[in-house]
Amino acid sequence: MSSFSYEPYYSTSYKRRYVETPRVHISSVRSGYSTARSAYSSYSAPVSSSLSVRRSYSSSSGSLMPSLENLDLSQVAAISNDLKSIRTQEKAQLQDLNDRFASFIERVHELEQQNKVLEAELLVLRQKHSEPSRFRALYEQEIRDLRLAAEDATNEKQALQGEREGLEETLRNLQARYEEEVLSREDAEGRLMEARKGADEAALARAELEKRIDSLMDEISFLKKVHEEEIAELQAQIQYAQISVEMDVTKPDLSAALKDIRAQYEKLAAKNMQNAEEWFKSRFTVLTESAAKNTDAVRAAKDEVSESRRLLKAKTLEIEACRGMNEALEKQLQELEDKQNADISAMQDTINKLENELRTTKSEMARYLKEYQDLLNVKMALDIEIAAYRKLLEGEETRLSFTSVGSITSGYSQSSQVFGRSAYGGLQTSSYLMSTRSFPSYYTSHVQEEQIEVEETIEAAKAEEAKDEPPSEGEAEEEEKDKEEAEEEEAAEEEEAAKEESEEAKEEEEGGEGEEGEETKEAEEEEKKVEGAGEEQAAKKKD
Protein backbone atom coordinates (compact mmCIF):
# COMPACT_ATOMS: atom_id res chain seq x y z
CA MET A 1 0.00 0.00 0.00
CA SER A 2 2.85 2.29 0.77
CA SER A 3 4.48 1.52 -2.52
CA PHE A 4 1.29 2.32 -4.43
CA SER A 5 0.88 5.59 -2.51
CA TYR A 6 4.47 6.72 -3.16
CA GLU A 7 4.41 6.38 -6.93
CA PRO A 8 1.45 8.70 -7.56
CA TYR A 9 3.02 11.33 -5.29
CA TYR A 10 6.22 11.21 -7.28
CA SER A 11 4.51 11.18 -10.64
CA THR A 12 1.99 14.01 -10.03
CA SER A 13 2.96 16.43 -7.31
CA TYR A 14 6.69 16.31 -7.94
CA LYS A 15 6.28 16.88 -11.67
CA ARG A 16 3.77 19.64 -11.09
CA ARG A 17 5.98 21.53 -8.62
CA TYR A 18 9.45 20.89 -9.99
CA VAL A 19 8.90 20.58 -13.74
CA GLU A 20 5.72 22.37 -14.75
CA THR A 21 6.30 25.44 -12.61
CA PRO A 22 9.63 26.41 -14.23
CA ARG A 23 8.13 25.83 -17.69
CA VAL A 24 5.22 28.14 -16.97
CA HIS A 25 7.62 30.69 -15.57
CA ILE A 26 9.84 30.53 -18.63
CA SER A 27 6.86 30.92 -20.98
CA SER A 28 5.71 33.97 -19.04
CA VAL A 29 9.21 35.34 -19.27
CA ARG A 30 9.17 34.93 -23.05
CA SER A 31 5.81 36.58 -23.44
CA GLY A 32 6.46 39.31 -20.87
CA TYR A 33 9.81 40.68 -21.87
CA SER A 34 12.29 39.14 -24.27
CA THR A 35 15.28 41.14 -23.06
CA ALA A 36 15.39 39.32 -19.73
CA ARG A 37 16.25 35.96 -21.30
CA SER A 38 19.95 36.43 -20.83
CA ALA A 39 19.47 37.43 -17.19
CA TYR A 40 17.14 34.53 -16.58
CA SER A 41 19.31 32.05 -18.44
CA SER A 42 22.32 33.18 -16.41
CA TYR A 43 20.44 32.32 -13.24
CA SER A 44 18.71 29.15 -14.44
CA ALA A 45 21.57 26.81 -13.55
CA PRO A 46 19.99 25.69 -10.28
CA VAL A 47 16.83 24.74 -12.14
CA SER A 48 18.78 22.64 -14.61
CA SER A 49 20.68 21.14 -11.72
CA SER A 50 17.42 20.34 -10.00
CA LEU A 51 16.13 18.81 -13.20
CA SER A 52 19.29 16.73 -13.47
CA VAL A 53 18.79 15.70 -9.85
CA ARG A 54 15.21 14.77 -10.70
CA ARG A 55 16.31 12.79 -13.73
CA SER A 56 19.01 11.01 -11.71
CA TYR A 57 16.56 10.39 -8.93
CA SER A 58 13.91 9.19 -11.33
CA SER A 59 16.43 6.90 -12.99
CA SER A 60 17.57 5.65 -9.62
CA SER A 61 13.98 5.31 -8.54
CA GLY A 62 13.27 3.47 -11.77
CA SER A 63 16.09 1.13 -11.01
CA LEU A 64 14.82 0.76 -7.49
CA MET A 65 11.20 0.20 -8.52
CA PRO A 66 11.47 -3.59 -8.48
CA SER A 67 12.95 -3.47 -4.98
CA LEU A 68 10.47 -0.98 -3.48
CA GLU A 69 8.60 -3.75 -1.86
CA ASN A 70 11.71 -4.63 0.09
CA LEU A 71 12.17 -1.04 1.46
CA ASP A 72 11.04 -0.27 4.93
CA LEU A 73 9.36 2.88 6.21
CA SER A 74 12.59 4.44 7.54
CA GLN A 75 14.12 4.53 4.10
CA VAL A 76 10.94 6.03 2.61
CA ALA A 77 10.96 8.76 5.27
CA ALA A 78 14.63 9.56 4.55
CA ILE A 79 13.95 9.81 0.82
CA SER A 80 10.91 12.03 1.42
CA ASN A 81 12.96 14.30 3.68
CA ASP A 82 15.64 14.56 0.98
CA LEU A 83 13.00 15.40 -1.60
CA LYS A 84 11.46 18.04 0.68
CA SER A 85 14.83 19.69 1.25
CA ILE A 86 15.51 19.68 -2.49
CA ARG A 87 12.05 21.16 -3.11
CA THR A 88 12.55 23.90 -0.58
CA GLN A 89 15.96 24.79 -2.05
CA GLU A 90 14.61 24.88 -5.58
CA LYS A 91 11.60 26.88 -4.47
CA ALA A 92 13.85 29.43 -2.77
CA GLN A 93 16.07 29.64 -5.86
CA LEU A 94 13.05 30.10 -8.14
CA GLN A 95 11.65 32.78 -5.84
CA ASP A 96 15.01 34.56 -5.88
CA LEU A 97 15.15 34.31 -9.66
CA ASN A 98 11.58 35.62 -9.99
CA ASP A 99 12.35 38.54 -7.70
CA ARG A 100 15.51 39.39 -9.61
CA PHE A 101 13.69 39.05 -12.92
CA ALA A 102 10.90 41.38 -11.70
CA SER A 103 13.50 43.90 -10.54
CA PHE A 104 15.20 43.67 -13.94
CA ILE A 105 11.89 44.26 -15.71
CA GLU A 106 11.12 47.25 -13.50
CA ARG A 107 14.59 48.63 -14.16
CA VAL A 108 14.13 48.18 -17.90
CA HIS A 109 10.77 49.99 -17.77
CA GLU A 110 12.30 52.83 -15.81
CA LEU A 111 15.19 53.10 -18.28
CA GLU A 112 12.75 53.07 -21.19
CA GLN A 113 10.72 55.88 -19.62
CA GLN A 114 13.88 57.87 -18.97
CA ASN A 115 14.99 57.22 -22.55
CA LYS A 116 11.63 58.47 -23.88
CA VAL A 117 11.86 61.60 -21.74
CA LEU A 118 15.41 62.25 -22.91
CA GLU A 119 14.42 61.66 -26.53
CA ALA A 120 11.55 64.15 -26.19
CA GLU A 121 13.89 66.72 -24.64
CA LEU A 122 16.46 66.06 -27.37
CA LEU A 123 13.79 66.49 -30.05
CA VAL A 124 12.64 69.78 -28.51
CA LEU A 125 16.22 71.05 -28.29
CA ARG A 126 16.93 70.01 -31.86
CA GLN A 127 13.80 71.78 -33.06
CA LYS A 128 14.78 74.91 -31.14
CA HIS A 129 18.30 74.91 -32.53
CA SER A 130 17.42 73.72 -36.03
CA GLU A 131 14.65 76.20 -36.90
CA PRO A 132 16.85 79.32 -37.24
CA SER A 133 19.54 77.37 -39.07
CA ARG A 134 16.90 75.86 -41.36
CA PHE A 135 15.50 79.30 -42.18
CA ARG A 136 18.99 80.58 -42.72
CA ALA A 137 19.83 77.67 -45.01
CA LEU A 138 16.63 78.23 -46.98
CA TYR A 139 17.29 81.94 -47.42
CA GLU A 140 20.95 81.36 -48.24
CA GLN A 141 19.89 78.84 -50.90
CA GLU A 142 17.35 81.36 -52.22
CA ILE A 143 20.03 84.08 -52.27
CA ARG A 144 22.41 81.75 -54.08
CA ASP A 145 19.74 80.95 -56.66
CA LEU A 146 19.01 84.64 -57.15
CA ARG A 147 22.70 85.42 -57.51
CA LEU A 148 23.04 82.64 -60.09
CA ALA A 149 20.01 84.02 -61.93
CA ALA A 150 21.54 87.52 -61.81
CA GLU A 151 24.83 86.14 -63.11
CA ASP A 152 23.01 84.30 -65.90
CA ALA A 153 21.15 87.50 -66.77
CA THR A 154 24.46 89.41 -66.77
CA ASN A 155 26.08 86.80 -69.01
CA GLU A 156 23.09 86.85 -71.34
CA LYS A 157 23.22 90.64 -71.36
CA GLN A 158 26.92 90.56 -72.23
CA ALA A 159 26.26 88.02 -74.99
CA LEU A 160 23.45 90.19 -76.36
CA GLN A 161 25.69 93.23 -76.16
CA GLY A 162 28.37 91.34 -78.12
CA GLU A 163 25.77 90.31 -80.69
CA ARG A 164 24.56 93.90 -80.80
CA GLU A 165 28.10 95.14 -81.39
CA GLY A 166 28.49 92.58 -84.20
CA LEU A 167 25.21 93.75 -85.75
CA GLU A 168 26.32 97.36 -85.40
CA GLU A 169 29.61 96.49 -87.14
CA THR A 170 27.67 94.77 -89.93
CA LEU A 171 25.39 97.81 -90.13
CA ARG A 172 28.40 100.12 -90.41
CA ASN A 173 29.88 97.94 -93.17
CA LEU A 174 26.56 97.95 -95.01
CA GLN A 175 26.31 101.72 -94.61
CA ALA A 176 29.84 102.17 -96.02
CA ARG A 177 28.99 99.85 -98.89
CA TYR A 178 25.75 101.75 -99.43
CA GLU A 179 27.65 105.03 -99.58
CA GLU A 180 30.10 103.50 -102.08
CA GLU A 181 27.19 102.27 -104.18
CA VAL A 182 25.59 105.72 -104.00
CA LEU A 183 28.85 107.29 -105.23
CA SER A 184 29.15 104.71 -108.02
CA ARG A 185 25.51 105.37 -108.91
CA GLU A 186 26.14 109.09 -109.08
CA ASP A 187 29.20 108.43 -111.27
CA ALA A 188 27.15 106.15 -113.52
CA GLU A 189 24.40 108.76 -113.68
CA GLY A 190 27.02 111.37 -114.67
CA ARG A 191 28.39 109.11 -117.38
CA LEU A 192 24.83 108.35 -118.47
CA MET A 193 24.12 112.07 -118.79
CA GLU A 194 27.27 112.51 -120.84
CA ALA A 195 26.28 109.54 -123.01
CA ARG A 196 22.80 111.01 -123.42
CA LYS A 197 24.34 114.32 -124.45
CA GLY A 198 26.58 112.50 -126.95
CA ALA A 199 23.57 110.56 -128.23
CA ASP A 200 21.59 113.78 -128.61
CA GLU A 201 24.49 115.40 -130.47
CA ALA A 202 24.85 112.30 -132.69
CA ALA A 203 21.10 112.38 -133.38
CA LEU A 204 21.33 116.06 -134.30
CA ALA A 205 24.34 115.39 -136.52
CA ARG A 206 22.51 112.51 -138.15
CA ALA A 207 19.49 114.70 -138.73
CA GLU A 208 21.69 117.37 -140.29
CA LEU A 209 23.42 114.76 -142.45
CA GLU A 210 20.07 113.34 -143.51
CA LYS A 211 18.97 116.85 -144.37
CA ARG A 212 22.15 117.39 -146.37
CA ILE A 213 21.62 114.05 -148.11
CA ASP A 214 18.10 115.11 -148.98
CA SER A 215 19.35 118.47 -150.23
CA LEU A 216 22.08 116.75 -152.25
CA MET A 217 19.60 114.31 -153.73
CA ASP A 218 17.38 117.25 -154.63
CA GLU A 219 20.38 118.99 -156.13
CA ILE A 220 21.31 115.85 -158.09
CA SER A 221 17.78 115.54 -159.40
CA PHE A 222 17.79 119.22 -160.28
CA LEU A 223 21.13 118.90 -162.06
CA LYS A 224 19.81 115.86 -163.96
CA LYS A 225 16.82 117.87 -165.06
CA VAL A 226 19.02 120.80 -166.04
CA HIS A 227 21.33 118.45 -167.90
CA GLU A 228 18.46 116.81 -169.71
CA GLU A 229 17.04 120.21 -170.60
CA GLU A 230 20.40 121.33 -171.89
CA ILE A 231 20.70 118.14 -173.91
CA ALA A 232 17.23 118.68 -175.27
CA GLU A 233 18.02 122.28 -176.17
CA LEU A 234 21.26 121.25 -177.82
CA GLN A 235 19.47 118.55 -179.81
CA ALA A 236 16.86 121.07 -180.80
CA GLN A 237 19.52 123.56 -181.82
CA ILE A 238 21.34 120.87 -183.74
CA GLN A 239 18.20 119.91 -185.57
CA TYR A 240 17.37 123.55 -186.29
CA ALA A 241 20.89 124.19 -187.46
CA GLN A 242 20.68 121.18 -189.81
CA ILE A 243 17.38 122.32 -191.16
CA SER A 244 18.57 125.85 -191.60
CA VAL A 245 21.75 124.71 -193.15
CA GLU A 246 19.92 122.41 -195.50
CA MET A 247 17.50 125.09 -196.31
CA ASP A 248 19.80 128.06 -196.51
CA VAL A 249 23.16 126.70 -197.35
CA THR A 250 23.25 124.13 -199.86
CA LYS A 251 26.63 124.74 -201.05
CA PRO A 252 29.11 123.49 -198.51
CA ASP A 253 28.76 120.10 -196.73
CA LEU A 254 28.32 120.73 -193.05
CA SER A 255 27.68 117.19 -191.95
CA ALA A 256 31.26 116.62 -191.00
CA ALA A 257 31.36 119.80 -189.01
CA LEU A 258 28.15 118.88 -187.25
CA LYS A 259 29.47 115.50 -186.50
CA ASP A 260 32.53 117.06 -185.03
CA ILE A 261 30.51 119.49 -182.99
CA ARG A 262 28.16 116.69 -181.89
CA ALA A 263 31.08 114.57 -180.91
CA GLN A 264 32.58 117.44 -178.99
CA TYR A 265 29.34 118.15 -177.17
CA GLU A 266 28.77 114.48 -176.47
CA LYS A 267 32.25 114.23 -175.06
CA LEU A 268 31.67 117.36 -173.01
CA ALA A 269 28.32 116.04 -171.77
CA ALA A 270 29.78 112.64 -170.96
CA LYS A 271 32.63 114.29 -169.18
CA ASN A 272 30.30 116.50 -167.21
CA MET A 273 28.08 113.50 -166.45
CA GLN A 274 31.06 111.51 -165.30
CA ASN A 275 32.34 114.37 -163.15
CA ALA A 276 28.91 114.84 -161.63
CA GLU A 277 28.57 111.10 -160.93
CA GLU A 278 32.03 110.96 -159.41
CA TRP A 279 31.32 113.97 -157.24
CA PHE A 280 27.97 112.50 -156.23
CA LYS A 281 29.52 109.12 -155.48
CA SER A 282 32.36 110.66 -153.47
CA ARG A 283 29.94 112.87 -151.64
CA PHE A 284 27.58 109.94 -151.04
CA THR A 285 30.43 107.76 -149.76
CA VAL A 286 31.57 110.53 -147.43
CA LEU A 287 28.05 111.03 -146.16
CA THR A 288 27.57 107.26 -145.87
CA GLU A 289 30.79 106.91 -143.92
CA SER A 290 29.88 109.81 -141.62
CA ALA A 291 26.38 108.35 -141.16
CA ALA A 292 27.88 104.92 -140.40
CA LYS A 293 30.27 106.49 -137.93
CA ASN A 294 27.42 108.39 -136.32
CA THR A 295 25.33 105.19 -136.30
CA ASP A 296 28.13 103.29 -134.59
CA ALA A 297 28.52 106.12 -132.09
CA VAL A 298 24.76 106.15 -131.49
CA ARG A 299 24.73 102.35 -131.16
CA ALA A 300 27.67 102.48 -128.74
CA ALA A 301 25.94 105.27 -126.83
CA LYS A 302 22.71 103.22 -126.75
CA ASP A 303 24.64 100.16 -125.60
CA GLU A 304 26.39 102.22 -122.94
CA VAL A 305 23.09 103.73 -121.85
CA SER A 306 21.45 100.28 -121.66
CA GLU A 307 24.46 98.94 -119.72
CA SER A 308 24.31 101.93 -117.39
CA ARG A 309 20.58 101.38 -116.93
CA ARG A 310 21.17 97.70 -116.22
CA LEU A 311 23.91 98.53 -113.71
CA LEU A 312 21.73 101.23 -112.17
CA LYS A 313 18.82 98.80 -111.85
CA ALA A 314 21.09 96.13 -110.30
CA LYS A 315 22.59 98.65 -107.87
CA THR A 316 19.11 99.93 -107.05
CA LEU A 317 17.92 96.38 -106.31
CA GLU A 318 21.03 95.73 -104.22
CA ILE A 319 20.51 98.99 -102.34
CA GLU A 320 16.87 98.04 -101.70
CA ALA A 321 17.98 94.60 -100.46
CA CYS A 322 20.59 96.18 -98.18
CA ARG A 323 18.01 98.65 -96.96
CA GLY A 324 15.55 95.84 -96.20
CA MET A 325 18.28 93.84 -94.44
CA ASN A 326 19.25 96.93 -92.46
CA GLU A 327 15.64 97.52 -91.44
CA ALA A 328 15.25 93.84 -90.47
CA LEU A 329 18.47 93.94 -88.44
CA GLU A 330 17.41 97.18 -86.75
CA LYS A 331 14.00 95.66 -85.97
CA GLN A 332 15.62 92.49 -84.61
CA LEU A 333 18.04 94.58 -82.55
CA GLN A 334 15.15 96.64 -81.17
CA GLU A 335 13.21 93.47 -80.32
CA LEU A 336 16.26 92.00 -78.60
CA GLU A 337 16.76 95.22 -76.62
CA ASP A 338 13.08 95.30 -75.63
CA LYS A 339 13.17 91.62 -74.62
CA GLN A 340 16.39 92.10 -72.70
CA ASN A 341 15.02 95.18 -70.92
CA ALA A 342 11.81 93.29 -70.09
CA ASP A 343 13.77 90.31 -68.75
CA ILE A 344 16.05 92.58 -66.74
CA SER A 345 13.09 94.50 -65.31
CA ALA A 346 11.30 91.22 -64.46
CA MET A 347 14.43 89.83 -62.79
CA GLN A 348 14.94 93.12 -60.95
CA ASP A 349 11.33 93.00 -59.75
CA THR A 350 11.83 89.40 -58.65
CA ILE A 351 15.05 90.32 -56.86
CA ASN A 352 13.36 93.27 -55.14
CA LYS A 353 10.40 91.09 -54.17
CA LEU A 354 12.66 88.39 -52.76
CA GLU A 355 14.76 91.00 -50.96
CA ASN A 356 11.58 92.44 -49.42
CA GLU A 357 10.47 88.93 -48.42
CA LEU A 358 13.91 88.26 -46.99
CA ARG A 359 13.79 91.55 -45.09
CA THR A 360 10.31 90.82 -43.73
CA THR A 361 11.35 87.28 -42.83
CA LYS A 362 14.41 88.59 -41.02
CA SER A 363 12.28 91.10 -39.15
CA GLU A 364 9.81 88.34 -38.26
CA MET A 365 12.68 86.13 -37.15
CA ALA A 366 14.03 88.96 -35.00
CA ARG A 367 10.51 89.47 -33.60
CA TYR A 368 10.19 85.76 -32.89
CA LEU A 369 13.59 85.77 -31.20
CA LYS A 370 12.54 88.77 -29.14
CA GLU A 371 9.29 87.04 -28.18
CA TYR A 372 11.28 83.92 -27.35
CA GLN A 373 13.57 86.00 -25.16
CA ASP A 374 10.57 87.59 -23.45
CA LEU A 375 9.00 84.18 -22.88
CA LEU A 376 12.33 82.92 -21.59
CA ASN A 377 12.47 85.86 -19.21
CA VAL A 378 8.92 85.12 -18.04
CA LYS A 379 9.83 81.44 -17.63
CA MET A 380 12.87 82.42 -15.60
CA ALA A 381 10.72 84.71 -13.47
CA LEU A 382 8.27 81.88 -12.86
CA ASP A 383 11.12 79.50 -12.04
CA ILE A 384 12.48 82.08 -9.61
CA GLU A 385 9.05 82.39 -8.00
CA ILE A 386 8.79 78.62 -7.72
CA ALA A 387 12.25 78.45 -6.17
CA ALA A 388 11.36 81.30 -3.81
CA TYR A 389 8.13 79.59 -2.77
CA ARG A 390 10.01 76.33 -2.36
CA LYS A 391 12.53 78.05 -0.14
CA LEU A 392 9.71 79.67 1.82
CA LEU A 393 8.00 76.32 2.25
CA GLU A 394 11.24 74.69 3.36
CA GLY A 395 11.82 77.54 5.79
CA GLU A 396 8.26 77.26 7.06
CA GLU A 397 8.61 73.51 7.45
CA THR A 398 11.81 73.92 9.45
CA ARG A 399 10.18 76.68 11.46
CA LEU A 400 7.14 74.50 12.18
CA SER A 401 9.29 72.07 14.10
CA PHE A 402 10.46 74.82 16.49
CA THR A 403 7.61 77.32 16.76
CA SER A 404 4.00 77.14 17.78
CA VAL A 405 1.01 76.85 15.52
CA GLY A 406 -0.09 80.48 15.87
CA SER A 407 3.29 81.94 15.10
CA ILE A 408 3.58 79.60 12.10
CA THR A 409 0.23 80.71 10.63
CA SER A 410 0.93 84.44 11.14
CA GLY A 411 4.44 84.16 9.75
CA TYR A 412 3.23 82.17 6.79
CA SER A 413 0.50 84.72 5.97
CA GLN A 414 2.97 87.62 6.16
CA SER A 415 5.60 85.84 4.09
CA SER A 416 3.00 84.78 1.49
CA GLN A 417 1.80 88.41 1.17
CA VAL A 418 5.35 89.66 0.82
CA PHE A 419 6.33 87.07 -1.74
CA GLY A 420 3.04 87.53 -3.58
CA ARG A 421 4.01 91.16 -4.14
CA SER A 422 7.51 90.13 -5.18
CA ALA A 423 6.12 87.53 -7.60
CA TYR A 424 3.78 90.15 -9.11
CA GLY A 425 6.72 92.50 -9.51
CA GLY A 426 8.75 89.69 -11.11
CA LEU A 427 6.01 89.15 -13.67
CA GLN A 428 5.89 92.86 -14.50
CA THR A 429 9.54 93.19 -15.50
CA SER A 430 12.33 90.85 -16.54
CA SER A 431 14.92 92.59 -14.35
CA TYR A 432 13.62 90.47 -11.43
CA LEU A 433 15.49 87.53 -12.99
CA MET A 434 18.85 88.71 -11.79
CA SER A 435 17.77 90.37 -8.54
CA THR A 436 16.57 87.32 -6.57
CA ARG A 437 18.80 85.61 -4.04
CA SER A 438 17.08 82.27 -3.81
CA PHE A 439 17.70 81.27 -7.49
CA PRO A 440 20.50 78.71 -8.01
CA SER A 441 23.73 80.09 -9.44
CA TYR A 442 24.03 77.25 -11.97
CA TYR A 443 20.57 77.91 -13.42
CA THR A 444 21.19 81.68 -13.60
CA SER A 445 24.47 81.11 -15.44
CA HIS A 446 22.73 78.73 -17.85
CA VAL A 447 19.93 81.22 -18.48
CA GLN A 448 22.46 84.01 -18.97
CA GLU A 449 24.23 81.88 -21.56
CA GLU A 450 20.93 81.30 -23.37
CA GLN A 451 20.19 85.03 -23.26
CA ILE A 452 23.64 85.79 -24.64
CA GLU A 453 23.11 83.29 -27.47
CA VAL A 454 19.71 84.80 -28.32
CA GLU A 455 21.17 88.33 -28.27
CA GLU A 456 24.04 87.19 -30.50
CA THR A 457 21.60 85.69 -33.02
CA ILE A 458 19.55 88.92 -32.98
CA GLU A 459 22.68 91.01 -33.46
CA ALA A 460 23.82 88.72 -36.30
CA ALA A 461 20.42 89.09 -38.01
CA LYS A 462 20.59 92.87 -37.59
CA ALA A 463 24.14 92.90 -38.95
CA GLU A 464 23.03 90.94 -42.02
CA GLU A 465 20.16 93.39 -42.55
CA ALA A 466 22.61 96.27 -42.19
CA LYS A 467 24.89 94.65 -44.77
CA ASP A 468 22.02 94.18 -47.19
CA GLU A 469 20.81 97.78 -46.82
CA PRO A 470 23.15 100.72 -46.20
CA PRO A 471 21.82 102.57 -43.14
CA SER A 472 20.96 106.24 -43.29
CA GLU A 473 22.35 108.88 -40.97
CA GLY A 474 19.33 108.75 -38.64
CA GLU A 475 19.43 104.96 -38.50
CA ALA A 476 23.17 105.02 -37.77
CA GLU A 477 22.57 107.43 -34.89
CA GLU A 478 19.73 105.23 -33.59
CA GLU A 479 21.96 102.16 -33.81
CA GLU A 480 24.70 103.96 -31.89
CA LYS A 481 22.17 104.97 -29.24
CA ASP A 482 20.85 101.40 -29.05
CA LYS A 483 24.40 100.08 -28.68
CA GLU A 484 25.13 102.60 -25.92
CA GLU A 485 21.89 101.67 -24.14
CA ALA A 486 22.68 97.97 -24.49
CA GLU A 487 26.17 98.54 -23.09
CA GLU A 488 24.69 100.53 -20.18
CA GLU A 489 22.15 97.76 -19.51
CA GLU A 490 24.87 95.12 -19.61
CA ALA A 491 26.99 97.16 -17.20
CA ALA A 492 24.00 97.61 -14.89
CA GLU A 493 23.23 93.88 -15.05
CA GLU A 494 26.85 93.04 -14.30
CA GLU A 495 26.78 95.39 -11.30
CA GLU A 496 23.53 93.83 -10.08
CA ALA A 497 24.96 90.34 -10.57
CA ALA A 498 28.06 91.32 -8.59
CA LYS A 499 25.88 92.76 -5.82
CA GLU A 500 23.76 89.62 -5.77
CA GLU A 501 26.83 87.41 -5.60
CA SER A 502 28.18 89.45 -2.70
CA GLU A 503 24.79 89.31 -0.95
CA GLU A 504 24.56 85.54 -1.56
CA ALA A 505 28.03 85.12 -0.11
CA LYS A 506 26.95 87.11 2.94
CA GLU A 507 23.81 85.02 3.29
CA GLU A 508 25.82 81.83 3.03
CA GLU A 509 28.14 83.11 5.76
CA GLU A 510 25.18 83.98 7.93
CA GLY A 511 23.97 80.36 7.42
CA GLY A 512 20.41 81.15 6.46
CA GLU A 513 19.44 82.41 9.97
CA GLY A 514 16.88 84.92 8.70
CA GLU A 515 13.66 85.75 10.48
CA GLU A 516 10.35 87.02 9.21
CA GLY A 517 11.30 90.69 9.58
CA GLU A 518 14.49 90.24 7.61
CA GLU A 519 12.63 88.35 4.88
CA THR A 520 10.02 91.09 4.62
CA LYS A 521 12.79 93.71 4.43
CA GLU A 522 14.57 91.76 1.72
CA ALA A 523 11.32 91.32 -0.19
CA GLU A 524 10.62 95.07 0.07
CA GLU A 525 14.14 95.85 -1.13
CA GLU A 526 13.68 93.46 -4.04
CA GLU A 527 10.36 95.11 -4.89
CA LYS A 528 12.03 98.52 -4.81
CA LYS A 529 14.81 97.28 -7.08
CA VAL A 530 12.28 95.76 -9.46
CA GLU A 531 10.22 98.95 -9.51
CA GLY A 532 13.36 101.04 -10.08
CA ALA A 533 14.45 98.79 -12.94
CA GLY A 534 10.95 98.95 -14.48
CA GLU A 535 10.96 102.76 -14.23
CA GLU A 536 14.40 102.88 -15.87
CA GLN A 537 13.21 100.67 -18.73
CA ALA A 538 10.04 102.75 -19.16
CA ALA A 539 12.15 105.94 -19.25
CA LYS A 540 14.46 104.37 -21.84
CA LYS A 541 11.49 103.32 -23.97
CA LYS A 542 10.07 106.86 -23.76
CA ASP A 543 13.46 108.29 -24.81
From Swiss-Prot:
Residues 93-124 are annotated as: Coil 1A. Keywords: Acetylation, Cell projection, Charcot-Marie-Tooth disease, Coiled coil, Cytoplasm, Cytoskeleton, Disease variant, Glycoprotein, Intermediate filament, Methylation, Neurodegeneration, Neuropathy, Phosphoprotein, Ubl conjugation. The keyword Acetylation applies. Glycans are attached at T21, S27. Residues 471-525 have a biased composition (Acidic residues). It is found in: Cell projection, Axon; Cytoplasm, Cytoskeleton. Residues 444-543 are annotated as: Tail, subdomain B (acidic). GO terms for molecular function: identical protein binding; phospholipase binding; protein domain specific binding; protein-containing complex binding; protein-macromolecule adaptor activity; structural constituent of cytoskeleton; structural constituent of postsynaptic intermediate filament cytoskeleton; tubulin binding. GO terms for biological process: anterograde axonal transport; axonal transport of mitochondrion; axonogenesis; cerebral cortex development; hippocampus development; intermediate filament organization; intermediate filament polymerization or depolymerization; locomotion. O-glycosylated. It comes from the Eukaryota. Changing E396K: In CMTDIG and CMT2E. Residues 138-234 are annotated as: Coil 1B. Residues 397-443 are annotated as: Tail, subdomain A. Residues 125-137 are annotated as: Linker 1. Residues 90-400 form the IF rod domain. PROSITE patterns: IF_ROD_1, IF_ROD_2. The modification Phosphothreonine is found at T520. Pfam families: Filament (PF00038), Filament_head (PF04732). The modification Asymmetric dimethylarginine is found at R23. NF-L is the most abundant of the three neurofilament proteins and, like the other nonepithelial intermediate filament proteins, it can form homomeric 10-nm filaments. Forms homodimers (in vitro). Forms heterodimers with NEFH or NEFM; which can further hetero-oligomerize (in vitro). Forms heterodimers with INA (in vitro). Interacts with ARHGEF28. Interacts with TRIM2. Belongs to the intermediate filament family. This is Neurofilament light polypeptide. It comes from Homo sapiens (Human).
